[in-house]
């Protein structure tokens, strides 16, 4: 039997630093412990020895050397590997964090620094009333963004005072009750479906939320357009490599903030990371739709995504319209049934476009798949000649296009048959120039087969473009999303029509806009202010009757129709290659892009992926596809874990369905994205 002296010799001293509330200086507590003492016992000893009456329930032990939390309170010190030289910190798990939202507003709230980022983001979104938190994540600003900000502050004569929405009283504790209104399927709208005004009757749902006290319209309403000076001072990517650098800062969703060296009160960005916006609904998504609109708006203004001048003017007109409606003091707190129906119709179209599921449950007659047949012009850039554009008779059926010398030869062998499943579809449209083109990038063994189709008018273009988009996803024109896609394309083309009318001239005289605030700096430099304003007002004529929420949805849909939409770029080096390439990650595919020319080289579909993994020793991502195709690459602009998580994240999001009642399989997410490091 051991004597008391033996017991004393088996124990040892453990020094623990303690964080105190209200910014008081840390204190060091020395405990006498033994290896069989569990973590909960250590914390109990600490509290008893300090003898300070306060709530210690949020405190936990953080191990500095191992950079990990000791959250399994039933584990012993021996099992954890804690010895006398361990540097332990007894600190709150929830700390203040500043989050810059997509609308450029900063909120300050209490966030769990011990939960994995995936869970922390879900809790943050509950506080902010944003559904589908799995689409968002936290981004550490790039060094280029920070340098621009510091330079601006240095050159400023006055101190920069940031407008912060302080939600300090809120807690994102995982166990805290959340208002059922956030996820209720039967609740009435949380805000007016037309003008976006929060409905007073619904504010009772958020009685415990700090947003009630601080006017949640700050998050649900769009912000005024930024001044040209503000735009000029912000970081704008000039190349695909610059865009790749912007995506290096995504946090690891499988690790906590503390494990990733995030400090208390540090500023991070909350962003939509995955471009699959599921189940958007104006009844419940006031904040979500507005933040999505704001992220799209800033992406256009800062040229994070390329668009034509014609498209830029459409975006400017929609911004102008949304800004006017948002600032209108006479907005009424009611909506007519017809107005609600308009928004629901716009939403239904948007939902189909964004892969949110079918618009209705009507069973299609799949025994008779529709076909398109018409004369179109064909152009192949690789056979570059002055008269390379030639007219053929085209037949579109299933997911393939065949073309013939003329209509009479349709029953014979086609000149060529193009299978569009898995191809890239790029619009090439200039409405004012009567140019309606469709660029097809079709994957072949040695890269991409580039083909241009030229249509004669809007209706023809809308039908063929919609068919191409569906075929690229493996769907036919029998799918219920075909007609909404056609309508959506026609609607967007209608917005692009220029209207030079006396009304525009009179509006110009009473102009209340600064046009340079509504377009990118590069676009603003090309035109005089009055000329730019006139063109924006011409475009505005086509959207002037839109309700506020529909205008935001149209902006999102126009953003979604841009060729670069949904692509996240990374600088990589493919195995066996001697030069760097850009890897584009989208919701359903990977694209290898030439870093110099920006031209897509090869596309690989997730649907054809058999497996992917990471060699953590050499930080190399390896992916195996059908037909014995395999690729491997190292990431140069970011950690390979970020790209690995993007691939797994998109596959995870593809498993969502409306029947799930918004419950997420968090274990599946970590299984697909966590890796084996």
From Swiss-Prot:
<dbReference type="InterPro" id="IPR019749">
    <property type="entry name" value="Band_41_domain"/>
</dbReference>
<dbReference type="Pfam" id="PF00169">
    <property type="entry name" value="PH"/>
</dbReference>
<dbReference type="GO" id="GO:0071636">
    <property type="term" value="P:positive regulation of transforming growth factor beta production"/>
</dbReference>
<feature type="modified residue" description="Phosphoserine">
    <location>
        <position position="179"/>
    </location>
</feature>
<dbReference type="InterPro" id="IPR037843">
    <property type="entry name" value="Kindlin/fermitin"/>
</dbReference>
<protein>
    <recommendedName>
        <fullName>Fermitin family homolog 1</fullName>
    </recommendedName>
</protein>
<keyword id="KW-0966">Cell projection</keyword>
<dbReference type="GO" id="GO:0010629">
    <property type="term" value="P:negative regulation of gene expression"/>
</dbReference>
<feature type="modified residue" description="Phosphoserine">
    <location>
        <position position="170"/>
    </location>
</feature>
<dbReference type="GO" id="GO:0005856">
    <property type="term" value="C:cytoskeleton"/>
</dbReference>
<feature type="domain" description="PH">
    <location>
        <begin position="377"/>
        <end position="473"/>
    </location>
</feature>
<dbReference type="InterPro" id="IPR001849">
    <property type="entry name" value="PH_domain"/>
</dbReference>
<dbReference type="InterPro" id="IPR037837">
    <property type="entry name" value="PH_Kindlin/fermitin"/>
</dbReference>
<dbReference type="GO" id="GO:0032587">
    <property type="term" value="C:ruffle membrane"/>
</dbReference>
<keyword id="KW-0965">Cell junction</keyword>
<dbReference type="GO" id="GO:0090162">
    <property type="term" value="P:establishment of epithelial cell polarity"/>
</dbReference>
<dbReference type="GO" id="GO:0042308">
    <property type="term" value="P:negative regulation of protein import into nucleus"/>
</dbReference>
<dbReference type="GO" id="GO:0007155">
    <property type="term" value="P:cell adhesion"/>
</dbReference>
<dbReference type="InterPro" id="IPR040790">
    <property type="entry name" value="Kindlin_2_N"/>
</dbReference>
<dbReference type="GO" id="GO:0051015">
    <property type="term" value="F:actin filament binding"/>
</dbReference>
<comment type="function">
    <text>Involved in cell adhesion. Contributes to integrin activation. When coexpressed with talin, potentiates activation of ITGA2B. Required for normal keratinocyte proliferation. Required for normal polarization of basal keratinocytes in skin, and for normal cell shape. Required for normal adhesion of keratinocytes to fibronectin and laminin, and for normal keratinocyte migration to wound sites.</text>
</comment>
<keyword id="KW-1003">Cell membrane</keyword>
<dbReference type="GO" id="GO:0071711">
    <property type="term" value="P:basement membrane organization"/>
</dbReference>
<keyword id="KW-0130">Cell adhesion</keyword>
<keyword id="KW-0472">Membrane</keyword>
<feature type="region of interest" description="Disordered">
    <location>
        <begin position="157"/>
        <end position="181"/>
    </location>
</feature>
<dbReference type="GO" id="GO:0005925">
    <property type="term" value="C:focal adhesion"/>
</dbReference>
<dbReference type="InterPro" id="IPR019748">
    <property type="entry name" value="FERM_central"/>
</dbReference>
<keyword id="KW-0206">Cytoskeleton</keyword>
<dbReference type="InterPro" id="IPR011993">
    <property type="entry name" value="PH-like_dom_sf"/>
</dbReference>
<dbReference type="GO" id="GO:0090090">
    <property type="term" value="P:negative regulation of canonical Wnt signaling pathway"/>
</dbReference>
<dbReference type="GO" id="GO:0030511">
    <property type="term" value="P:positive regulation of transforming growth factor beta receptor signaling pathway"/>
</dbReference>
<dbReference type="GO" id="GO:0033630">
    <property type="term" value="P:positive regulation of cell adhesion mediated by integrin"/>
</dbReference>
<dbReference type="GO" id="GO:0001954">
    <property type="term" value="P:positive regulation of cell-matrix adhesion"/>
</dbReference>
<dbReference type="GO" id="GO:0051886">
    <property type="term" value="P:negative regulation of timing of anagen"/>
</dbReference>
<dbReference type="GO" id="GO:0005829">
    <property type="term" value="C:cytosol"/>
</dbReference>
<dbReference type="GO" id="GO:0030054">
    <property type="term" value="C:cell junction"/>
</dbReference>
<keyword id="KW-0963">Cytoplasm</keyword>
<comment type="subunit">
    <text>Interacts with the cytoplasmic domain of integrins ITGB1 and ITGB3.</text>
</comment>
<dbReference type="GO" id="GO:0033625">
    <property type="term" value="P:positive regulation of integrin activation"/>
</dbReference>
<dbReference type="GO" id="GO:0007229">
    <property type="term" value="P:integrin-mediated signaling pathway"/>
</dbReference>
<dbReference type="Pfam" id="PF18124">
    <property type="entry name" value="Kindlin_2_N"/>
</dbReference>
